[in-house]
Amino acid sequence: MSEISVLAIVSEIFPLIKTGGLADVAGALPAALAGEGIEVATLVPGYPAVMAQIEYAETVIDARPLYGAPARVLRGSAAGLDLFVLDAPHLYDRPGNPYLLPDGRDFPDNPFRFAALCQTGSALGFGAAPGFLPDIVHAHDWQAGLAAAYLHYDGRERPGTVATIHNLAFQGKYPAELLGALGLPPQAFSLEGVEYYGTIGFLKAALALSDRITTVSPTYAAEIRTPEHGMGLDGLLRTRAERLIGILNGIDDEVWDPSSDPLITEPFDVETLARRPANKAALQDKFGLDPDPGALLLGVVSRLSWQKGLDLLLANLDLLERLGVQLAVLGSGEPELVRQLLEAAEARPGRVGAVIGYDEAIAHRIQAGADAIVIPSRFEPCGLTQLCALRYGALPIVARVGGLADTIIDANEMALASGIGTGLQFSPPTADMLGATLERAARLWAEPEIWDELIENGMLTDVSWRRPAALYAKLFRDLVRER
């Protein structure tokens, strides 16, 4: 019997449905917490992909009207996860991206879609499902943010509440006139509640009303308390600083294991790095790059957005050509960046290759085949790509922000002398500083003994969920003890 029961509320979860790192965290953390005596059940919307994969499902909350049509709650399992599923076809039975119309705009009913998720989470928190009464409700990102409000304003004795910020840039702000329609009482629309500059703030509600706030790296926890990175919420976060903690993410080291990865060409580990070049050759072929084992091959797996700094990399294409460096990019996002990237690939055949979209298998192949992974983010709450790069023997080249600063040891002179470097950092995140760091990478590439030492250091780094899970478990235990 587990000592603490947690209900996680998420809008996506790997391997059922994924648009970003939130899904990876939601999918991997429950198993890691089980080893700490924490039992996690996860509430997720009944998207088509979820409904197709859930097994042994039984109805635990009967159908009732919810924003225009009946909805019910199922409990079942998929991929080893204990799941509650909000089965509401009128809200979730839509193809493609779970948040966006095909033209990239938000679904206009998103406030109701995710309020429904939060109201269901609140009901489960109060024991609406037979045999399940969680000690803690753990809400992830803005889509789950109103759960704290529904629990707070209900008036009954409630479970503890924890809000996790995966990216403060996405806040879920909606018109104030929706307050009643969303089932919130008038008193909720206050500075201490859901009100946020005249709107209803889903994430703001979570940050104001939750017992604890976590975010996904210590550096990001400090950054978001500043006007530069606080996205308008820095004042609130400063007032709640004693309730805020940064806990680094891990990765699922069974899914991300180069020694047994079925998605890559040639499995390898730190003892068999001589096998790794076969993956590089396959990657060059996949992206239409020249079959040159001696060329430094940079990989990118990213959203194509201003935040991720892909424009900084595109500004250095002439430099990469002078250095004889190749580039393979997997990503999707802002149309202008997509256009520039495709133009670069067309103008530089054999040197630049691009696949637009997201493909899990190609992401694994880039990690296994690229010599280095470039992550030039202007801000980065944690980042998982650099953790995968460490595990797969690709040198992370990262901006010194957020979780990138916390997880990569820059190979400066002191680190090289001490034998502890694991990658390259640059600051500030500008095109010129990235260019200088790419030149530094090219110089290190020309010294195979040093390069190999950095790669081996990275592969020996523990990037699993073991330590983060222990920190979450302590947070949950402390909260239960205080209540």
Curated annotation (Swiss-Prot):
The GO annotation for biological process reads: glycogen biosynthetic process
**A Pfam family in this protein?**
Glycos_transf_1
According to UniProt, the reaction catalysed is:
[(1->4)-alpha-D-glucosyl](n) + ADP-alpha-D-glucose = [(1->4)-alpha-D-glucosyl](n+1) + ADP + H(+)
Which Gene Ontology terms cover its molecular function? alpha-1,4-glucan glucosyltransferase (ADP-glucose donor) activity; alpha-1,4-glucan glucosyltransferase (UDP-glucose donor) activity
The UniProt annotation places ADP-alpha-D-glucose binding at 18
Q: Which CDD domains match?
A: GT5_Glycogen_synthase_DULL1-like (cd03791)
UniProt keyword annotation of Glycosyltransferase present: yes
What keywords sit in the KW lines? Glycogen biosynthesis, Glycosyltransferase, Transferase
Write out the GO cellular component annotations.
cytosol
Record-linked InterPro entries: Glyco_trans_1, GS/SS, Starch_synth_cat_dom
Name the enzyme's class: transferase
The pathway noted for it is: Glycan biosynthesis; glycogen biosynthesis
Assigned protein family? Belongs to the glycosyltransferase 1 family. Bacterial/plant glycogen synthase subfamily.
Per its database record, what is this protein's job?
A: Synthesizes alpha-1,4-glucan chains using ADP-glucose.
Q: What is this protein called?
A: Glycogen synthase
In which organism is this protein found? Methylocella silvestris (strain DSM 15510 / CIP 108128 / LMG 27833 / NCIMB 13906 / BL2)
The UniProt gene name for this protein comes to glgA
